């Protein structure tokens, strides 16, 4: 693991230097930079937080909690900040080292700033964690024996735990998962395919732990995942004062729990009698949650977390529960291609050492949309719950555009609109126009724009689609329809999802086949919809044969999706 950490940090540093050597325009197009920021004001309660107006909205990869370097085209100076809050037309940035936004090159009227994704050397955190595994009591007594397959802890009574859940409103597989987690002597994994109520099971399990007086840690790779889990737990528990997040404040809309910079500053640090929940990223644990041993450590979205990162969390407790799905998005490693990076997922690695319970009842997709992911990724085990199985796309005003009506036929939940283009790279205008026209028809037919999402592999295609949407929809509707890459959509759902693949030129496909045909990304993209998924793709993607056995297998998965869909040749 040490070699992976060192190689990855070196690769990240080299990639950052390469990216920063490019002109601003190229950095923006790559999605790692936001240009056209104008300082507006400091936050009234905290002068280290300032609002910056966005010239064209946020079309980058940058999200709340990300580290950025704020600079100017005319100054060598820069400020290191964290994205504290993201709004429709502005970004709130918090200085990482505190202080006040008082630099004239930032605050002077008319000054335009640029925010780039920053490089932060996290290697010391990883190396300290790896060393602690060898030197601490938890490492020596729990982690090392478990990883070596020599853990001898006895399980609690599973049947007793299951019987205690008799009155729960969870389905049987959710009850199995919660009971297994509560009875696990050391570690248990819960696989949550799309829409199967993973967060619900997590919240009920944590609630029972807290009411039993346990101290619980919830951690994840992203702030958003931690916020979602804490929101669910606080709502289920009904005592938000027993739920906190530790770390530099990141804006959380409507959350009932509070954020504290350090654990010692919150009331729970002085409560030795009752159970409570702490949310924190793994990096925060070593510096802001010192000398706290949790009764249970819960890792959410574990499919995206690497094993070295998971160890930071595992060092804070003797029982570990991992919630995630190895068939959805995996870890992103600069030093490894996606297929190899996926194998470093803590969820995949630990599934060889601990039992896994797979949730199998979906509450999102109707029966027609459930078939392909169930057979392709989950061995036919995933089924639509009766309450959603028969659901169909319902348009209050009927289809307002006869040209796209076949694609919106409620009898066909999964549709492939087949294009004949052969020159698509990262932008394909015919697909962009078709996507915009479908959205326009849906909105005119009574569907809300916020119930529609368009998922793309390339940011330039997203920009082209937004351009066409602005010409067909009122401004507010165009903004509410999400057009983004699959990373933005994991964990979200919409009534209708449109997937625009864009690419079709043979040489381009040969270079990017490993990325375009990734099964995990495809799984996430097509399982966001409740009643309708429309795939816009050239027939070239169905017939192209990439080099390499692994990529050939991935391409076969994509073809199986198209074969499962109702095909419509593009004619609108």
Q: What residues fall within each predicted segment?
A:
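Pre-ATPase regulatory/linker segments immediately N-terminal to the P-loop/RecA-like helicase/translocase core
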Residues: 59-179, 240, 246, 253-259
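Conserved helix-turn-beta segment of the N-terminal RecA-like "Helicase ATP-binding" lobe
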Residues: 224-255, 467-476
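Inter-Walker segment of RecA-like/P-loop motor cores
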Residues: 236-286, 484
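Conserved helicase motor core of SF1/SF2 NTP-dependent helicases
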Residues: 211-214, 220-227, 283-299, 303-572
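Hydrophobic anchor at the beta1->P-loop junction of P-loop NTPases
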Residues: 190, 218
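Walker A/P-loop NTP-binding motif
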Residues: 183-186, 199-214, 232-234
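N-terminal pre-P-loop "Q-motif" helix
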Residues: 166-186, 201, 280, 430
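Accessory interdomain/linker segments of ATP-dependent helicases and helicase-like nucleic-acid enzymes
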Residues: 1-76, 411-413, 422, 433, ...
């Amino acid at each position: 693991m040490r070699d992976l950490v060192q190689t990855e940090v070196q690769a990240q540093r080299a990639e950052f230097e390469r990216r920063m050597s490019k002109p601003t325009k190229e950095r923006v197009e790559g999605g790692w930079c936001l240009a056209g920021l104008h300082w507006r004001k400091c936050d009234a309660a905290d002068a280290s937080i300032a609002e910056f107006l966005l010239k064209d909205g946020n079309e980058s990869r940058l999200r709340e909690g990300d580290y950025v370097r704020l600079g100017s085209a005319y100054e060598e100076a820069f400020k290191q900040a964290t994205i504290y809050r993201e709004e429709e037309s502005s970004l709130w940035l918090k200085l990482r080292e505190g202080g006040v936004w008082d630099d004239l090159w930032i605050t002077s009227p008319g000054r335009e700033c640029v925010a780039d994704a920053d490089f932060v050397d996290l290697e010391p955190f990883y190396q300290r964690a790896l060393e602690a595994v060898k030197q601490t009591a938890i490492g020596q007594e729990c982690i090392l024996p478990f990883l070596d397959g020599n853990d001898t802890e006895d399980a609690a009574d599973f049947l007793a735990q299951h019987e205690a859940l008799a009155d729960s409103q969870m389905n049987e597989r959710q009850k199995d998962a919660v009971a297994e987690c509560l009875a696990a002597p050391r570690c248990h994994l819960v696989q949550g395919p799309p829409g199967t109520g993973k967060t619900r099971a997590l919240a009920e399990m944590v609630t029972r732990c807290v009411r039993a007086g346990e101290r619980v840690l919830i951690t994840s790779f992203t702030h958003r995942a931690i916020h979602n889990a804490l929101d669910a737990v606080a709502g289920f528990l009904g005592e938000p004062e027993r739920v906190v997040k530790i770390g530099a404040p990141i804006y959380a809309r409507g959350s009932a729990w509070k954020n504290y910079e350090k654990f010692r500053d919150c009331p729970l640090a002085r409560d030795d009698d009752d159970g409570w929940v702490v949310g924190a990223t793994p990096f925060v644990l070593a510096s802001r949650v010192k000398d706290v041993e949790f009764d249970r450590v819960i890792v959410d979205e574990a499919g995206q977390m690497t094993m070295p990162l998971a160890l930071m969390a595992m060092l804070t407790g003797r029982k570990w529960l991992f919630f995630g799905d190895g068939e959805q998005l995996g870890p992103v490693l600069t030093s490894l291609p996606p297929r190899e990076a996926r194998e470093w997922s803590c969820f995949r690695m630990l599934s060889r050492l601990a039992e896994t319970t797979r949730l199998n009842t979906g509450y999102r997709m109707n029966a027609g949309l459930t078939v392909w992911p169930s057979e392709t990724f989950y061995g036919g085990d995933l089924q639509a719950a009766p309450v959603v199985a028969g659901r169909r796309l319902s348009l209050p005003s009927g289809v307002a555009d006869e040209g796209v009506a076949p694609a919106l036929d409620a009898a066909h939940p999964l549709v492939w609109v087949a294009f004949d283009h052969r020159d698509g790279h990262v932008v394909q205008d015919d697909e962009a126009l078709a996507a915009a026209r479908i959205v326009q028809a849906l909105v005119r037919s009574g569907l809300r724009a916020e119930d529609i999402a368009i998922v793309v592999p390339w940011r330039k295609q997203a920009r082209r689609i937004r351009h066409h949407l602005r010409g067909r929809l009122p401004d507010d509707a165009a903004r509410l329809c999400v057009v983004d890459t699959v990373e933005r959509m994991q964990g979200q759902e919409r009534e209708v999802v449109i997937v625009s693949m864009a690419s079709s030129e043979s040489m381009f496909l040969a270079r990017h086949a490993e990325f375009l045909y990734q099964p995990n990304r495809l799984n996430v993209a097509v399982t966001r919809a409740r009643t309708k998924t429309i795939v816009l793709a050239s027939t070239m993607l169905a017939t192209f044969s990439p080099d390499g056995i692994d990529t050939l297998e991935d391409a076969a998965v994509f073809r199986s999706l198209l074969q499962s869909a109702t095909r419509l040749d593009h004619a609108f």
